[in-house]
From Swiss-Prot:
Component of the cytochrome c oxidase (complex IV, CIV), a multisubunit enzyme composed of 12 subunits. The complex is composed of a catalytic core of 3 subunits COX1, COX2 and COX3, encoded in the mitochondrial DNA, and 9 supernumerary subunits COX4, COX5A (or COX5B), COX6, COX7, COX8, COX9, COX12, COX13 and COX26, which are encoded in the nuclear genome. Its cofactor is Cu cation. This is Cytochrome c oxidase subunit 2. Pfam families: COX2, COX2_TM. Residues 65-78 are mitochondrial matrix. The keyword Cell inner membrane does not apply. It comes from the Eukaryota. The lineage of its organism: Eukaryota, Fungi, Dikarya, Ascomycota, Saccharomycotina. Residues 1-15 form a propeptide. It comes from Saccharomyces cerevisiae (strain ATCC 204508 / S288c) (Baker's yeast). Mg(2+) binds at residue 223. It is a multi-pass membrane protein.
Length: 251
């Protein structure tokens, strides 16, 4: 019993899938997503402080004017308060904007990736190409990924999230995702990895990721792309480097 309790206390269950009525982010698995979470929490703190201050000022003004409206009848403007409510919000916006721009540029940087994976959006499935690897036939390792239909789902699989084949990647490796589309605009989005990039026909967009823990991460197309839009899930399995090489040899 004590061993079971100790296991429960020392085991962290990560939230890497959408959950009903969720009001917060999924657990981060990359430095980019960790930065997004930290920025969100910091901004929310400032917003709550501002909300409390504005609510207190509004309540105070309403109560003051209600008790003695005649005394303030001929006050038309106040230069001091006008200067304050102009400068103070500008300072707050600068405080918020500065770290936002830093994070934005950091997320866009792709520095010396160890491998490149190309994700191509189709109506309504994904195709993945491991451009750095060639199989025994001399061809690039590539495969297509389709959603598992409801009637073929097995116990434990997630509806509209599980796919017949998964993208397999190694952890602690700088990965560059090159994203495009073959027909209409799609969007390659995996919340836990902090990835959301448009897949545009005729254009190559790129984003990097450094996955720091093993696990299965789910995403989906986040751009309305037709009647089968809901049937474009993304499933990424992050494994250790030896397991990744073993999987690669099987392709």
């Amino acid at each position: 019993m004590l061993d079971l309790l100790r296991l429960q206390l020392t085991t962290f269950i990560m939230n890497d899938v959408p959950t009903p009525y969720a009001c917060y982010f999924q657990d981060s698995a990359t430095p980019n997503q960790e930065g997004i979470l930290e920025l969100h929490d910091n901004i929310m703190f400032y917003l709550l402080v501002i909300l409390g201050l504005v609510s207190w000022m509004l309540y105070t003004i309403v109560m003051t004017y209600s008790k003695n409206p005649i005394a303030y009848k001929y006050i038309k403007h106040g230069q001091t308060i006008e200067v304050i409510w102009t400068i103070f919000p500008a300072v707050i916006l600068l405080i918020i904007a500065f770290p936002s721009f830093i994070l934005l540029y950091l997320c866009d940087e792709v520095i010396s990736p160890a491998m490149t994976i190309k994700a191509i959006g189709y109506q309504w499935y994904w195709k993945y190409e491991y451009s750095d690897f060639i199989n025994d036939s001399g061809e690039t390792v590539e495969f297509e990924s389709y959603v598992i239909p409801d009637e073929l789902l097995e116990e434990g699989q997630l509806r509209l999230l599980d796919t017949d084949t998964s993208m397999v990647v190694p952890v602690d490796t700088h990965i560059r995702f090159v994203v495009t589309a073959a027909d209409v605009i799609h969007d390659f989005a995996i919340p836990s990895l902090g990835i959301k990039v448009d897949a545009t026909p005729g254009r190559l967009n790129q984003v990097s990721a450094l996955i720091q823990r093993e696990g299965v991460f789910y995403g989906a197309c986040s751009e309305l792309c037709g009647t089968g839009h809901a049937n474009m899930p993304i499933k990424i399995e992050a494994v250790s480097l030896p397991k990744f090489l073993e999987w690669l040899n099987e392709q």
